[in-house]
């Protein structure tokens, strides 16, 4: 995409890579769909890096402003979808 992902420059390179993979998965949910287990695994790693709800909301807002995609709505949809199913928005 032609925009800059919201990143915290205090994160390690490994953490940045994990967060970017999560952002890419959110994009794929809107564009094609992603297997629920894969998305939730990336979300769990994201939550290890960003454990605070306030920080998650801030990142979601920034991500939505640049991409048009909502992390919150995507994860809510994933929680509604059965195991081994595709999450699609």
From Swiss-Prot:
Q: SUPFAM superfamilies, from UniProt? A: BH2638-like (SSF158504)
Which residues belong to the signal peptide in this entry? none
- Family designation: Belongs to the UPF0223 family.
Tell me which NCBIfam families the record gives.
Answer: PRK04387.1
Q: Which domain of life is it from?
A: Bacteria
Name it: UPF0223 protein BcerKBAB4_3787
Pfam families from the UniProt entry? UPF0223 (PF05256)
**InterPro entries xrefs:** BH2638-like_sf, UPF0223
